[in-house]
Amino acid sequence: MDTISENKCFGGTQGVYSHASAATGGTMTFGLFLPEEAANGPVPVLIYLSGLTCTHENAMTKSGAQAFAAEQGIALVFPDTSPRGDGVADTDGFDMGLAASFYVDATQDPWKPHYQMETYITRDLMQALADFPLDMDRVSITGHSMGGHGALTLALKHPDMFRSVSAFSPICHPTASDWGQRQFEGYLGSDKSVWADHDATLLMRSNGYDKPVLVDQGTADQFYDKLNTGDFAAACADARADAQIRLQSGYDHSYFFIASFIADHVDFHAQALYA
């Protein structure tokens, strides 16, 4: 583990760290906010997965989440959105390759050697976090857009790992979206039954979910037609999930939207983490 930076923030520390990952075959970077309570013992954890084109920095510097996490005594983790470095496959587009992993474990070349992001988040990152004063029995997850897709699918697939899940503007039904179909074929191959294991709507339909769910979606989101929020809401209703799906009038897909409602999400997770 290498320390890249540490800065005092809302009485705690905002750090940036790098570590070796067996899953991605390279060095990964993440941000970690530790509230001041961490000086006295382990604190609960909220992981934030960012969206397309992002790094670990975007939510760390734009969401304002640290202020509300400090009030609740919760740590925040900001992972990167893909592997990086020499030899890591990429495309010219913004929606596949670097910063566009869709948080899946790729099975197809040229992606397979490094794009093992589900394993990275659920194994390697968790192992790295064990070096810090964190209560790894109390972990929740959130995310935005592609990261919202990642948060929902990882929570649905690993229900014992996360106590609650939330998302801003998530890609809710990627197997039925331009944001998902091409990427899944590239990363996972042409077998659509494999795709279903990475689709929040289909996972909710098939498995249900017994932990709290919160989704915020802006009505002025310029990518609304790609996100299929209604499909996920219907799946939650059919599964009788403990889910709040909120449409926020006039809000778009930007970090201004996230900053407007991040306090609600931190409070939502605090209820589950301290239950």
Task: Please identify what each model-predicted range represents.
Residues 1-275:
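Non-catalytic cap/lid and distal C-terminal segments of serine-dependent acyl enzymes
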